[in-house]
Amino acid sequence: MSSLREEELINILPKDGPTVEEVKKYLEKYNDEFIIIKCGGSVLVDPKLFKVFIEDVVVLKKLGFNPIIVHGGGKRINSKLLEVNIKSNFINGLRVTDKDTINIVEDVLIEFNKEIVEALNELDCKAKRITSKENNIITVVQENKDLGFVGRPTGINKEFLTEIIKANKVPVIAPLGLDKDNQTFNINADTTAGSIAIELKARRLMIISDVEGVLDSEKKLIPEINSKKANELIDQEVISGGMIPKIKNCLDVASNGVKAVVIIDGRKNHSLLFELLSDKGSGTLIRE
């Protein structure tokens, strides 16, 4: 994919990241493909982790990848709702979103989106804001009435998204969408990233979280998993709670044209680079 010389790679890569030899080997395996990166708000609220994440995205761009960022914002939303005395309620991991809540959710996510774009621009990496108010690409229908303004994606504007990428910019996408009446809806960020990955038939969907990956019954990391093994672990309650919908979403994405989904630990330095460009990888790779 990349024709960068060794000295150029040395200048681009972080000293505590994958080696030049590994990167050269893995770059040959990729060919101008899309990498969707969903980063949870729980990781991005930490200033040090935020800085490393931004730097790693810039590295990928310099290496010739087409990274597309979808960000969460749950922790910031919770804090803001607490400030105004609105209680956060969830049904099956989805935030119940009434009229007052959706306005706050939208404001918080748009502000967060702006911060990510500005951080990339500061490192001379051109980025484009995609929110419900600016360059929206996601159409939705209501998930169900009990959840209020929570949407399920029904369409992605693939043409506009590819135009941004052809202009050599990194799309930065907030998990928000509009219905046929231009009403804003909150969308689960994993679902948003999955829908975009499927639409673009991405090479990878990387889900950066504050967990190591999928763990077995002895709390050891499982490096790779398929639908059969995942369903067994769900039946055995080894995979439980909020991890169940996350894994089911990953399996759905992997069975719809995306080569693999990876859950990686954003608390570890350069986990994104190690997963894509090293022998040891990072996290749990999920295939159909």
Curated annotation (Swiss-Prot):
Q: In which pathway does it act?
A: Amino-acid biosynthesis; L-arginine biosynthesis; N(2)-acetyl-L-ornithine from L-glutamate: step 2/4
Query: InterPro entries in the record, alphabetically?
Result: AceGlu_kinase-like_sf, AcgluKinase_fam, ArgB, Asp/Glu/Uridylate_kinase, Glu/AcGlu_kinase, NAGK-C
Q: Which organism is it from?
A: Pelagibacter ubique (strain HTCC1062)
Mainly resides where?
cytoplasm
Q: Which CDD domains match?
A: AAK_NAGK-C
Question: Keywords on this record?
Answer: Amino-acid biosynthesis, Arginine biosynthesis, ATP-binding, Cytoplasm, Kinase, Nucleotide-binding, Transferase
Database matches in HAMAP family: ArgB (MF_00082)
Site (Transition state stabilizer) location in chain: K38, K246
UniProt-listed Enzyme Commission number(s): 2.7.2.8
> What is the role of this chain?
Catalyzes the ATP-dependent phosphorylation of N-acetyl-L-glutamate.
User: Protein name, please?
Assistant: Acetylglutamate kinase
Write out the residues that bind substrate: G73, G74, R95, N186
Organism classification: Bacteria, Pseudomonadati, Pseudomonadota, Alphaproteobacteria, Candidatus Pelagibacterales
Q: What class of enzyme is it?
A: transferase
Q: Where in the cell is it found?
A: Cytoplasm
Q: Record's family?
A: Belongs to the acetylglutamate kinase family. ArgB subfamily.
Q: Which reaction does it catalyse?
A: N-acetyl-L-glutamate + ATP = N-acetyl-L-glutamyl 5-phosphate + ADP
One Pfam family, short name: AA_kinase
What one GO molecular function would you report for this record?
ATP binding
Output the Gene Ontology cellular-component terms: cytoplasm
